[in-house]
């Protein structure tokens, strides 16, 4: 309901915008959004590896990284982890992970992260290994050090409010300058699967500020694209580099949204007669599945409508597999066999058409995006040199 209300507000504000400003490529705001989905993060990781490879080829630069091309990178749950991996700096102030490093990360650490260690009275996994590996990989790096703007969501169960970690919020809310490993664990701490995460930071006057956080999907329902667009809109309004962009002018936004796959277009369907016999537990499981599937579809529908209303449908690309079956639908099956299947899903997805009405494949669409991102980066660099 909250997502629907937010969209309607955005939609009518956009329709009210009468700007006829032509899109200037060098001033376009580029946005990458990555869904949550546990081990299914392997699917968008395959897409990211392909896109980064295309950028390296187009610019003839093997050191090109995604963070060099996107103004905002947002993610929730496993998407938040991917966001951190490609934006957190190493000792050379470059992303500590290339896109090609992400799938091997899942294969190495996934079986340990999703190794049953809980109890029937608590979360399925104790989260200790996940937190440990995040600390090892991300170190003491904080939000302000991210190489581009980030938008990572979580939900505070003590204040009952979403918490959005972004660089642009730090001036007003310095307590949000948390360590990246705390943020990554928090956004991945899905109820039932991992324990909530408690940590503290400090306010501008030095007072202790505490967080009690769970999975960002509770705040963004798995798909952070609307959140990422909101952060990008604020960035466009506040950064002089985007001076020609009018408020909420989606003609000058380029959005790539990556999903982690859904069940065969609502593969698990039910009749009213069946559901009438369910108890509370059965309903809880079904509602979670229905909510995740519906929210992914509706967010895509909302955003598509907005971009079409501004005659900018080519500025938005949603990459999603809607026909997952068997073990690939599970967010915590980190067996080697299932992870290999997820790699195949991602590689096959690249060859599929973007829509039933378009012959363009995802691979072709991503190549088109890579050229746009490359040209825009060059134009901006030339403008900055004057």
Curated annotation (Swiss-Prot):
Keywords: Coiled coil, Glycoprotein, Hydrolase, Lipid degradation, Lipid metabolism, Plant defense, Signal, Storage protein, Vacuole. Residues 321-384 form a coiled coil. It holds the Pfam family Patatin. Its EC number is 3.1.1.-. It is found in: Vacuole. Its main location: other. A motif (GXGXXG) lies at residues 36-41. Residues 1-23 form the signal peptide. Glycans are attached at residue 115. The active site is at residues 77, 215. Residues 32-229 form the PNPLA domain. GO terms for cellular component: vacuole. A motif (GXSXG) lies at residues 75-79. Belongs to the patatin family. Patatin have a dual role as a somatic storage protein and as an enzyme involved in host resistance. This is Patatin-06. It comes from Solanum tuberosum.
